[in-house]
A protein has these predicted regions:
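Hydrophobic helical membrane-anchoring modules
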Residues: 104-105, 110-143
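Conserved core of the sugar-phosphate nucleotidyltransferase
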Residues: 4-8, 17-108
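Single, functionally critical "micro-switch" positions that shape active/binding sites
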Residues: 14, 85, 114-115
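Short aromatic-hydrophobic micro-motifs that form the base-stacking/packing surface
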Residues: 10-12
Length: 143
């Protein structure tokens, strides 16, 4: 039994290790001020998806005859880096998602996931390079 009370549960996914300093704090503040049940990390989502069936492709999320310009699409992609959920919602639904859901938009690097050895190697190379030098990552201190 817990000896202290809390209003929110924060899930941080270990397979999405790149996060800017302060981003999680800002996401929690946005969740509280917006009074939502769930807030999740996201990036802009603009691709057109096709599904292969046998030897043909079919559009999934658009009409090829009335295809919008990518700049006119405002969908978001759930990155899975983190979730901020009201405790009462989490226990009521036994799920991270309540009815009022909001996203916290991150950048491309925050959306990178490590699910394969290739992805691990890619992120490792990024961290060793100067590409993320000015990214202000939240990383453990070297000892």
């Amino acid at each position: 039994k817990l000896k202290y009370d809390f209003d929110y549960v924060v899930f941080i996914q270990p397979t999405s290790p790149l996060r800017k300093k302060g981003e999680l704090d800002n996401a929690i503040k946005k969740s509280i001020s917006s009074k939502v049940d769930t807030l999740f990390s996201s990036t802009d989502y603009k691709p057109f998806i096709w599904r292969k069936k046998r030897t043909n492709l079919f559009p999934i999320n658009f009409d090829p005859l009335r295809r919008k310009r990518r700049q006119k699409i405002f969908d978001v992609n759930e990155t899975g880096s983190y979730y901020v959920v009201k405790k009462k919602i989490f226990f009521k639904y036994k799920n991270r998602f309540g009815r009022k859901v909001l996203n916290f938009n991150s950048n491309f690097y925050n959306s990178l996931e490590i699910d394969t050895l290739e992805e691990f190697n890619y992120i490792e190379k990024l961290l060793k390079s100067s590409i993320l030098k000015n990214f202000n990552l939240c990383l453990p201190k070297k000892t």
